[in-house]
Amino acid sequence: MKTTLVITLTLTLFLFVAPAVTADQAQEIMRTRIDTIHETGSLTVGEDPIAAVRLIPVLYEGRDFRLVWNRPGLIEDLMAVIGEAPDHGLDPADYHYEAIRSRLDTAAQGLTGTTSKVDLDLLLTDAFARIAFTLHFGKLDPEDLDPVWNLSREFAENSDVIDLFLMALEEGSLREFLVASAPDIPVYSRLVKALRKHRALAAAGGWPMVPEGPILKPGERSPRVKDLRARLAVTDGPVETSGDPELFDEAVEEAVKRFQTRHYLDTDGKVGPKTVEALNVPIESRIDQIRASLERIRWIFRDVPDDFIIADIAGFRLHLFRDREPAWTTRIQVGKPYHATPVFKDEMTYLVLNPTWTIPPGILRKETLPAIRRDPDYLKKKNMSVIRSDGSVVDPSTVDFNGKFPYGIRQEPGPGNALGRVKFIFPNPYFVYFHDTPSKGLFGRSARAFSHGCIRTENPLDLAALLLEDKEGWDRARIDKVVDSAKMTTVTLDEPMTVFLLYWTAEVDADGIISFREDIYNRDGKIIDGLNAPFDFEAPDKLPASLR
């Protein structure tokens, strides 16, 4: 409240008490600034580089070089949103915050002139362009971090940008416009609240460490249990005690299980090395996980359809959304670190019941052929066929598996098929899809990175029934009947289903409970480095199409 009052008073002095500036003087100086952009492709105000060098000339030329930020309330709204940038994991310094504050203070002392006012107007416009763009798209370009990124950025025309900007200025709705730039979905707003909470915890000293040592088990006594209670109390609330704070009683066990669940650990109630490691992750690291997750959401969630599927890679879960609300979820297995499941978006168009599996060349060369050489009956045991490029079957007794192998190998439909009873296809260049698996026991593991990159689904027939529920003649009974027939059957979806394969290591559920996941593919570090680095970005001359 005090900061807002100071800014308001400063702006009042700036607008109404500062030395008068004639329109002609300001317009001429602004014209020279715009000419500099045209001549050099860049502009610096003081020590602050201007990013929106393609948008700014069009804006000011269209206004005959008149200043924009000349009405009470506009600057306060912009500064308020920039001041809230840390809630989004962003840095106010990226938006000229201190440079603007300094110039406003100077103006309030009556020490400013026409040139300073023009430069302040440019800084404010550039700050607006920066914060609007980064709230919507993120600070970093994901294509610089992930070579297989396929979610495109769509921009509106210059005229749309300027019309929206000027409309927000005219209607006094600048703050609302900027707030609407951020993703309007619960998963984002919940993380914003969690980030505020964790920053407050950090300011209060964070949480205590739990000393390493032997596995702590329910019923035991140890001085470390007292430390454990203190640590859990910070994030999970006070842990009841029966009178002995060093006793690992039932209340401690239940608190440990809740913590393990939230951190994707084996929920056994024991405090072993993995649990101690998770308990002792510094709060600053957890804050960075939230910041990285917010940035990823800004990259992804634009123009999201009402119905879609999210495969949460780091969380090992698949979610089906109806009307943008979670409708169904199941556990999944994802790629091993050296077979990392990629992040991308595509459209699911069909599914196959009782699929065959044509073994990919890499797996064929590294795993299948060596297994055949070791065991002549391997093909029969695995229900596999040797095939030509046209799909016709070759008698394996005529094949020299120790020499050059010009064929493929296909696993036929059946209970032992690596793809199980169904696969879900969303054509993509990475050959990734959802499928059933005979390896059901692995779903009981807390960390489930076991596949070669595709996504194994725990309850695939339930998913098939949900996707086909509006397709005439395809109820669950028919699905089961086709599966029992062991006959390969392709079923086309009436409407394509958007599929997102996403990766984030922090998430908050509808009850406000945050969960942290292991960064299994070591992807967070580059994002945090980029968020902490100086702003290095040229804003586009267009605004995101979804803000038109």
List PLM regions with ranges:
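Positively charged n-region of N-terminal signal peptides that target proteins for export
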Residues: 1-5
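Bacterial N-terminal signal peptides
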Residues: 7-16
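Cationic-aromatic interfacial patches
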Residues: 23-158, 162
